[in-house]
């Protein structure tokens, strides 16, 4: 399938654009405060998008994560038109300017005391941040991504030089068949181009919207089971893999 718009998390984000992905691990018992925090930030993100400082924002709540130290509770995406815009936004971000803007945008919804209380709380225990860039994806079926949609997430560590070719030439065609069978909404393959100091040693990520697929439903080479199984085996051995499931709860869409 030909390359199309990168429609993974919001309606319009094209090849060449990047996403900054924050995997957020909360302090114990901080879930309600975290929702208040995101609701406070939401009008700020929407205004930044309107001013063309970024192109999108979305928050996913993890339903199922791997057993690991400080497993993430939420996944937050900020989308930018290119790497330069993302870097410029992060390098020039001024908290005092942002705070005043947030107060102005929320003056009819939250008091200054509420804002101050939330901002002074330690809600996030750790944030593992990755900047990712799209390599390729299937087309998207079933309309726009919306609140309540499900995300199947995979984080990979590349183990050999053939890994990307296996994703693009073995696994992507299999996911395209799952899409044609109505089992998924979209599959996307991204590469990590930057990360913060506490981020894990991951090189790539895959994302599947509304995944109802059975891996046994589709073979890559249906006429040769041995060759099909060998290709899949070598593809799986070309990377380390952890997976998780999440639900979309906030979006600029």
Model regions and ranges:
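Short S/T/G/P-rich N-terminal loop/turn motif that feeds into the first structured element of a domain
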Residues: 16-75, 79-99, 108-253
């Amino acid at each position: 399938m030909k390359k199309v718009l990168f429609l993974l998390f919001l309606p319009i984000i094209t090849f060449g654009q990047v996403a900054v992905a924050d995997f957020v691990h909360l302090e114990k018992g901080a879930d309600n405060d975290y929702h208040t925090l995101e609701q406070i930030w939401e009008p700020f993100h929407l205004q930044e998008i309107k001013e063309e400082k970024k192109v999108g924002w979305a928050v996913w709540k993890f339903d199922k994560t791997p057993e690991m130290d400080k497993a993430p509770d939420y996944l937050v995406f900020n989308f930018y038109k290119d790497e330069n815009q993302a870097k410029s936004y992060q390098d020039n971000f001024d908290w005092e300017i942002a705070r005043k803007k947030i107060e102005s945008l929320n003056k009819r919804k939250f008091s200054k005391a509420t804002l101050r209380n939330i901002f002074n709380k330690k809600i996030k225990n750790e944030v593992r941040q990755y900047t990712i860039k799209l390599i390729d994806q299937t087309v998207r079926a079933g309309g726009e991504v919306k609140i309540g949609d499900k995300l199947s997430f995979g984080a990979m560590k590349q183990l050999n030089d053939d890994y990307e070719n296996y994703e693009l030439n073995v696994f992507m065609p299999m996911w395209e068949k799952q899409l044609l069978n109505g089992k998924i909404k979209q599959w996307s393959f991204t590469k990590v181009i930057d990360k913060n100091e506490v981020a894990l040693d991951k090189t790539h990520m895959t994302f599947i919207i509304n995944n109802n697929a059975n891996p046994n439903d589709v073979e890559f080479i249906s006429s040769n089971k041995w060759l099909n199984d060998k290709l899949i085996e070598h593809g799986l051995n070309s990377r380390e893999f952890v997976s998780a499931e999440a639900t979309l709860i906030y979006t600029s869409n």
